[in-house]
Amino acid sequence: FWLLNVLFPPHTTPKAELSNHTRPVILVPGCLGNPDVVNWMCYRFTIWLDLNMFLPLGVDVPGFGKTYSVEYLDNSKAAPYDWRLEPSQQEEYYLKISLGAPWGGSDLHFEEGWYDLLAGLPAPGVEVYCLYGVGLPTPRXYIFDXGFPYXDPVQQQPVHLLPLPGTQHLNMVFSXQTLEXINAILLG
């Protein structure tokens, strides 16, 4: 973006004359439920628009996952340990070890340690739709018994499980099956 500022400094950007017939331009950027990173549109506008109003929008979608690229937040590019630095420069690495990430407790032979965090977790209390992909091989298989983590939470509102055959997890948002299922849910 700095190159655009050099080539097209803000004071040389042509602006449209405002009149009563000029309709306002309202941009609403969203980041798929990621509240941690500001959308790039929040601090850089396009050079060919004279914006009258700008509304950055962050929609929090719990459980959707993080949508940012690790290059923006992590100088080590998501590598847990950078061998080029001395250990005293990587205190975060040792903190991650103490919290169990990124190995999930397998280095301590305590993979089930997170079960205690889910004990007594209340049901959400709203009608729930769960869309998930099936029918593709995965590197690991998780088999949950009827007592996961201790007992299934019970709620009065229905919980709908909608399998999507042949849909990969990360491609689910681009799948036509997913959009059809969402339309059926929203439109009835």
UniProtKB/Swiss-Prot annotation:
Carbohydrate attachment residues: 20
Main localization, broad class: secreted
Pfam families in alphabetical order: LCAT (PF02450)
Tissue-level expression: Detected in blood plasma (at protein level).
Active site: residue positions: 169 (charge relay system)
Catalytic activity: a sterol + a 1,2-diacyl-sn-glycero-3-phosphocholine = a sterol ester + a 1-acyl-sn-glycero-3-phosphocholine; a 1-O-alkyl-2-acetyl-sn-glycero-3-phosphocholine + H2O = a 1-O-alkyl-sn-glycero-3-phosphocholine + acetate + H(+); a 1-hexadecanoyl-2-acyl-sn-glycero-3-phosphocholine + (24S)-hydroxycholesterol = (24S)-24-hydroxycholesterol ester + 1-hexadecanoyl-sn-glycero-3-phosphocholine; (24S)-hydroxycholesterol + 1-hexadecanoyl-2-(9Z,12Z-octadecadienoyl)-sn-glycero-3-phosphocholine = (24S)-hydroxycholesterol 3-linoleoate + 1-hexadecanoyl-sn-glycero-3-phosphocholine
Localization in the cell: Secreted
UniProt keyword annotations, A-Z: Acyltransferase, Cholesterol metabolism, Glycoprotein, Hydrolase, Lipid metabolism, Secreted, Steroid metabolism, Sterol metabolism, Transferase
EC number: 2.3.1.43, 3.1.1.47
Family from the record: Belongs to the AB hydrolase superfamily. Lipase family.
Protein name: Phosphatidylcholine-sterol acyltransferase
Species of origin: Sus scrofa
Gene: LCAT
